[in-house]
Amino acid sequence: MTRDTQLRAAAQQSEWDLIVVGGGATGLGIAVQAAVQGYQVLLLEAGDWAGGTSSRSTKLLHGGVRYLAQGHLGLVRDALQERQTVIRNASSLAKPLQFVLPAYSVWDQWRYRLGLWAYEGLAGNASLGESAWLDASEVATHSPELRQGLRGLVTYWDGQFDDAGLAVALMHTATRLGAVAINHAQVLSVLTQPSGLAHQNLAHDRDQSTERENLRACGVRWRDQLSGDVHQAYAPCVINATGGWVDGLRAASNARSVTWSRGAHIVVRREFWPHAHGMIIPRTRDGRVLFVLPWLDHVLMGTTDTPCDGMDAHPRASAQELDFILEEAGRYLQRAPTRDDVLSVWAGVRSLVQANASLQTSTRSIGREHSIWQDANGLVNVAGGKWTTYRLMAEQVMKFCCRHKLVNPNIPEVSTRHLALDCALPDAWADRPGASIELLPGVSEAFVRWCVQVTSAQTVEDVLARRSRWLLLDARRASQAAADVARVMQEEGV
């Protein structure tokens, strides 16, 4: 379904059951959950699907061994259950991945083994595989790239997925179920009205009405970022799922709701870790873990946890973060990567929820739990969380809206636990014109046309960063293909 089709559908309808603002993991999940229950849903995303933090993750579906060590047992248990759900419902985009955890002492050996035993115990029937111990004599065969001196390795299982691909799958699933979803559609303000009155000619922009009491959110004012046209849409329930931008859509509040943390990643050639399994570096100098992962015939290393002052549409990793990742990986790999080996550097900004986000708290100590709350004007906000638990978050948001009677509470709940997602793949375009004209490995002219016509890609970045992942894999090669991608998109009317 093309973006133009979605725009026409939105133009034919001004009133909805709910409006979701934000097309990342959280907003897309909510749109699917609401649509499967039969609500009329409008989803608006200022940029591309998963154009912010949701496409800049470490590509893992996991409970989080670090969160287990920090005592976030509920988060870990929920995430391990949801990990299996995502892999089952989006099997072409997600898979189990084995990890190795190096141990250099007897203490490390038993600590890691006991910790992973607890990790598997929390997974219960959702376990992806048993952990195992490989002694030093087996390491040379299993993972010879590791530095010598190891006592052995603990192996365990987690999940890996295509974050941007899953976002597109959720968009397709939501629209198949009846939602209208538009990317590159920026919400300018929340509309409000006096409680109990119809919206006609009474709605105000939030900025014009914050001094008035008893006003309720009744819709949004939004702009098509491509045409410049401004529209209004109305709904008794407006959900703010904008991640780190959550406070920008809210009326004035007493305290900031989120703290921000930047996570940087680097990509190097496969030769540094030529395995189908990943490695977790259990203890960096700042107390985090670091991952070394096989990813699209390359190696992904990350991530960092750097406090930052706010959201950025295009966050950049610092030189210190780049050096940190290289140094920490070099402590464990016999051949340490250098700056010259780095093909791409990129970062995402996490939104972390704590009781008072204005307090100076180490972001490493803040869990990845999510929070759902309602402002005085009725705007529903959701922040925090992680990709692995997106479905659970969406389910809880809709229960919250029903409990507060923002949507019809008589509509029965419907579980999405076994809902197969529409994982659109370009295979059917293999015989289309341009299929043999390759711009990058895996990126043909036909693929670019598929991105525009099927996935609502509207910019070169949409194609190179999120439909393919070349901008994250090898920025230089992606840049060299940008002009050809733009030419094909222009032929498609974009």
Model regions and ranges:
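Extreme N-terminal leader/targeting segments of oxidoreductases
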Residues: M1-L18, Q33-Q37
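Core beta-strand elements of the Rossmann-like FAD/NAD(P) dinucleotide-binding domain
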Residues: S14-W16, S227-C237
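Flavin (primarily FAD) binding-site architecture
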Residues: N240-S253
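Short hydrophobic core segments
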Residues: V21, Q232-G243
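C-terminal catalytic lobe of FAD-dependent flavoproteins
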Residues: G165, T173, G248, A255-L300, ...
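Glycine-rich FAD pyrophosphate-binding loop
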Residues: A35-R56
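Dinucleotide-binding Rossmann-like beta1-alpha1 core, especially the glycine-rich loop
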Residues: T58-H142
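Flavin (FAD/FMN) cofactor-binding and adjacent substrate-gating region
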Residues: A103-L177, I182, L191, N214, ...
